[in-house]
Amino acid sequence: MSTRKLQKRKILPNDSIYNSLLVSQTINKILSKGKKNIARYIFYKSMQNIEKIKNENPLDIFKKAVDNATPSIELRTQKRKKGQISKISIKTKLERRNKIALKFIINSAKKRSEKNIIQKLQGEILDAYNNTGAAVQKKEEIEKSKSPVNNNKKFISKNKKSKNKKQKKRLKRKKNIY
């Protein structure tokens, strides 16, 4: 066992304009090469553009867009016996779901074909708000692949049954010995 003390998780401060934790997480996801002021500028400028287009509170639009892009499960790879690798879907906490949704939105915004990143992010947020766009499609792909869960449950239940059979055989052997 290590003798090091466990580090406490750093609490992320809310952003200065919208006073929202979700916004500060998004700014940190946009961040590249340590230039946080540029990341803030990109996000706030895209929110201003959204406000001009929709004439609504941009924070509400952004929260709805993140809600539409959040998957209910997460796919993870698992190694089984004999080197088999399979994907298993796992239910995740709300905090983790939001992080995944932000990753989907920002990565799909970077792949868009608009002129600059501000327009790309603005377009992806509006698309996610309207339940269209690459981020929502990625969420739907993950939710369609829930079938590996059932395969995993069958695999686990077969192993449990076989262990019970082995235990019964051992008990019979012990009874025969005495």
Swiss-Prot record:
Cell location: Plastid
Gene expressing this chain: rps7
Assembly: Part of the 30S ribosomal subunit.
Transmembrane segments: none
SUPFAM superfamilies xref list: Ribosomal protein S7 (SSF47973)
Residue pairs linked by disulfide bridges in the UniProt entry: none
Record organism: Euglena longa (Euglenophycean alga)
MF annotations from Gene Ontology: rRNA binding; structural constituent of ribosome
Basic residues: bias regions: 155-178
Cross-referenced InterPro entries: Ribosomal_uS7, Ribosomal_uS7_bac/org-type, Ribosomal_uS7_CS, Ribosomal_uS7_dom, Ribosomal_uS7_dom_sf
Organism domain of life: Eukaryota
Taxon lineage: Eukaryota, Discoba, Euglenozoa, Euglenida, Spirocuta
Keywords: Plastid, Ribonucleoprotein, Ribosomal protein, RNA-binding, rRNA-binding
Family membership: Belongs to the universal ribosomal protein uS7 family.
GO BP field: translation
Keyword Phosphoprotein in record: no
GO terms for cellular component: plastid; small ribosomal subunit
The protein's name in its UniProt record: Small ribosomal subunit protein uS7c
PANTHER family assigned: RIBOSOMAL PROTEIN S7
Region (Disordered): 137-178
Function: One of the primary rRNA binding proteins, it binds directly to 16S rRNA where it nucleates assembly of the head domain of the 30S subunit.
Biased composition (Basic and acidic residues): 137-146
